[in-house]
Amino acid sequence: MACDFLMVQRYENIVLAKVMKERLLDATSITSLGEALVAECDRTAKISLVIDVSEVGYLSSSMIGKLVAVHKAAKLGKGRVAIAGLKPTLLQMFKITQLDKLFEFMPEAEQAIMTYRRKPL
């Protein structure tokens, strides 16, 4: 399923996936985004996936579940996932559920890309 609100840029094994939707609530959007992100993990061995959510204002619990599935897919390929641009209220949700220990969080996508370039897998 294609995801028309996801822009993907590749820099060798670093993949920037920018989510261009403010609210991730409906099942169709969540499914298509989750499938597109997992496909990137499957396509790129030792992926360093940066998910830029700077335009996202709300994540449903289902979307958080999809992000966990994306993390698992990346780990299967010996990769890693950073979430960039997460708003403080959304970051708090990850902390409450202790999922902040699962992901790397970066203030901006550019910082995540630079960090991953300095520390390749």
Task: Give, region by region, the residue ranges found by the protein language model.
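A charged, well-structured terminal subsegment
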Residues: 104-121
